[in-house]
């Protein structure tokens, strides 16, 4: 049985800004069970429940995925598979219209 590679987690500057803004506007979202469940699943490489509408993105976001946290709030992320470790990149956390997704 092969051992799972370590997972490195990184955050874009825009994700950090989105997270900070969301914490000011709607702090309850960040402690809500849907956000915590999404982060738990991603960090543990588990599939997200179907109601998160997790899907691959296309166009300028090709290679990324997004999932719906609550209403129009989406989390955009990417898994990057590398030789020594895998990386989970958090890119955006904002309402759909603010993420340039179509």
Swiss-Prot record:
Toxic component of a type II toxin-antitoxin (TA) system. Its cognate antitoxin is RelB. Gene3D superfamilies: RelE-like (3.30.2310.20). It comes from the Bacteria. GO terms for molecular function: RNA endonuclease activity. This is Putative toxin YafQ. Keywords: Toxin-antitoxin system. Belongs to the RelE toxin family. YafQ subfamily. Pfam families: YafQ_toxin. It comes from Haemophilus influenzae (strain ATCC 51907 / DSM 11121 / KW20 / Rd). GO terms for biological process: mRNA catabolic process; translational termination. SUPFAM superfamilies: RelE-like. InterPro entries: RelE/ParE_toxin (IPR007712), RelE/ParE_toxin_dom_sf (IPR035093), Toxin_YafQ-like (IPR004386).
């Amino acid at each position: 049985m092969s051992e799972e590679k370590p997972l490195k987690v990184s955050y874009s500057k825009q994700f950090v800004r989105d997270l900070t803004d969301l914490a000011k506007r709607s702090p309850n979202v960040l402690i809500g069970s849907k956000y915590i469940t999404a982060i738990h699943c991603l960090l543990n490489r588990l599939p997200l429940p179907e109601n998160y509408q997790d899907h691959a993105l296309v166009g300028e976001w090709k290679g990324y995925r997004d999932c719906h946290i609550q209403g129009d709030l989406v989390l955009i992320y990417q898994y990057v598979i590398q030789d020594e470790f895998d990386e989970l990149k958090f890119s955006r956390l904002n309402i759909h219209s603010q993420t340039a997704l179509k």
